[in-house]
Every structure is written in C-alpha cells, then in structure tokens.
From Swiss-Prot:
Organism: Pasteurella multocida (strain Pm70)
Superkingdom assignment: Bacteria
InterPro entries linked to this entry: DUF6630, DUF7821
One Pfam family cited in the UniProt record for this chain: DUF6630
Family, per entry: To P.multocida PM0657.
Stated name of the protein: Uncharacterized protein PM1082
C-alpha cells in the first residue's frame, strides 16, 4: 500500500471505532508518538483543555477560522468560507507528533540531538475525484496546534529534504498500522535482515555477527558476564541485562569497527580512521566541527557517509557506509532493534 492508502486505512479505523486519540509510549524513534484525528473546530476546546483563546493569542490569531484558512491554502485546498464555520461546519485532519534523534532541520542540528515534528494529514479528493490526503509538516514545533497549522509546509516528494520527512512519516504510519492490526505486514525475516545488514556493511565475519545477535536474544546474562570479564561493564549477580547496551557493546561496536569518541571529536584521529576505511586520503580541518558538518564534508568528497550507534551516553560511536545504502541500513537497523541513527 502507498502512504496515502495506509493513512486512509487508519482514518477508516478511527471512524469505525470512534477512537480519535492515540498514544504510544514507545515508538520506532525511541520516544512517544501521539496522534489525533480532529473535527475542527468542534474538538478544539477539549484538545486545548479550554485554553483555546490563550493558544490562539499565543499563535497570533483572533479566531478559529484564520489558522484553518492558512492550513488549507498551504495544502492547495480551497478553504471554506467564514460563514460555513459560523454555521457549525467542521473539517477533518490528522496530527501525528513525535520526537526523533539526529535532527533533519538545519536550524536544530548544531544545538540539539532531537527534533520534534508534527505532521498534518488532510483528507481531500485528487484531480480525478478519488479520496486522497495532502501531507504537511511543522518543525520545530511547540505543541501549539494553531501555530502548527499556520507554520506548516506542504511536503514535496520531489524535494530531497522533504523525502527524509516523508520517510519518517511512513515509518510512523507503518508503526501505527502494526499496533492497530491494520493490514499487519508479514513477519520480519530476521535471518534475511541480518544477511542484508552484514552484506551492506561488508562485515568480514558474518557468522560471528549473527552468532552474537542470537546470543543476545537467547542468553543475555552470559553476554553481560563476558563484558564484565573484559572490563567493559559492571554488574552484580542477578542483574538484568539491558538489551540496548548489549546490542551496542557486545555486538555493534566491536563488529562494525566503529570510531568511538566523547562529544569532543579529535579531527586528526577521525581523519585517519576515515582515510583507512574509505581507502583514500581524507583530511578534516583542525577547527571543531559539528558531526553533521563532518558528514557533509565526507559526502561531498566521497561516496560514503557516517552513521552513529546511540550509546545513551555523552559520546559517539561512528561507522561508515555507502551513501546509496544509508536508507536501507537504517530500515534494517529498526527491524533488528539496533539503535543506529543518521546525522
């Protein structure tokens, strides 16, 4: 199914079950995901806890009509007349919100490690009269719905920057479909996913990688004990292993030949690491660079890019992959529950 078809399936679920709000504490992005199906403006008093006028003023509006007009105009949908709203008309749209690691918004990259985005999906009809949806997004966002409506931008599938946001939206929608049992996808073939992952990253000892993955699934206590004996972890008898830590320290970090560093990256050491991995000289300037700036330089001068293994500490665990394989590697990482993120 296409993204629009999946969203329409979720809309059918909403209308069939009369469930208009969704909250998932754990999403594929590592943080909560919220979604609400609005009848606007009928749902606004409840959605704003009767603080609608406060939020309207905060967003620079004086009435409910103006933000709706702005939203629909940006979506290339003819707005209703003010009279239609006064007469009790309501208009429908989805708002899907979540945080994700490694911001896409250039204004956030230098100062934050997460980005809070709101997607607005408006039911409509296409030029052929078929049911469809217009997709918009707002980032950064403060959670004020009226601001989100006024600041939203129409997603363009032909724009490279928007493609990254569309990929996030598709992953969020797939997650919702799975949780709501809406045309649930076929079970993930873990063996095939592991094979593809190790092949794309050219992991030399594929058998050892798969063996360690299985050990984490089957005997995590033994994996933790091995790390304790090697001096990489502290634990007492009976401690329950953190699987995310095991995936990082027992599997990914040693098998991906990663470059591990604290938040202050040594450009000379990283230059040497990158030169060895990509097979040609690559030199970074001495001045401090943000990780995304390093990635931009690497991508400009080679076919490679950098990804990061989330360590849940104030540090990086970087590894190299081909630019053309980045999207697929991130998809496989989510399937395998690997905390791998882009910059």
């Amino acid at each position: 199914m296409t993204l629009i078809e999946k969203l329409r399936k979720i809309e059918d679920y909403v209308l069939q079950h009369c469930q208009y709000r969704f909250y998932f504490a754990k999403s594929p992005f590592g943080m909560a995901l919220r979604a609400q199906y609005y009848y606007y403006p009928e749902d606004i008093p409840e959605a704003t806890k009767n603080l609608a006028n406060h939020f309207l003023t905060q967003a620079g509006y004086e009435d409910f009509y103006t933000p709706l007009e702005a939203l629909m105009s940006k979506a290339n949908i003819t707005p209703p007349s003010p009279a239609e709203m006064i007469e009790g008309g309501n208009w429908r749209f989805f708002a899907i919100k979540f945080n994700f690691f490694s911001p896409l918004n250039p204004a956030l990259k230098k100062y934050y490690n997460t980005e809070y985005v709101t997607f607005i999906c408006i039911p409509c009809q296409d030029h052929e009269g078929q049911d469809s949806m217009e997709l918009l997004y707002t980032s950064p966002t403060t959670g004020n719905l009226f601001k989100e409506m006024g600041n939203s931008q129409l997603l363009d599938p032909n724009c490279e920057a928007d493609q990254a946001y569309l990929q996030l939206l598709e992953e969020a929608v797939d997650f919702m479909c799975e949780k709501l049992d809406i045309d649930a996808p076929e079970p993930i073939d873990i063996t095939e996913a592991l094979h593809d992952f190790t092949t794309l990253l050219n992991i030399h000892d594929k058998e050892e990688f798969i063996k360690r993955y299985q050990q984490i699934q089957e005997t995590p206590e033994k994996c933790l004990l091995d790390l304790v004996e090697q001096g990489y972890a502290d634990a007492e008898e009976g401690d329950k292993p953190e699987l995310a830590f095991l995936r990082y320290r027992f599997l990914l970090q040693p098998m991906l030949d990663s470059f591990d560093t604290d938040w202050c990256i040594d450009n000379e050491e990283l230059s040497e690491y990158l030169s060895n991995v990509i097979g040609k000289k690559f030199k970074l300037p001495q001045k401090a660079l943000e990780p995304y700036e390093i990635v931009e330089r690497l991508e400009k001068k080679s076919d490679y890019t950098l990804l990061n293994i989330e360590t849940e500490q104030d540090s990086y665990s970087l590894f190299v992959c081909k630019q053309k394989d980045k999207k697929r590697i991130l998809q496989l990482a989510r399937m395998l529950d690997f905390a791998i993120v882009p910059f």
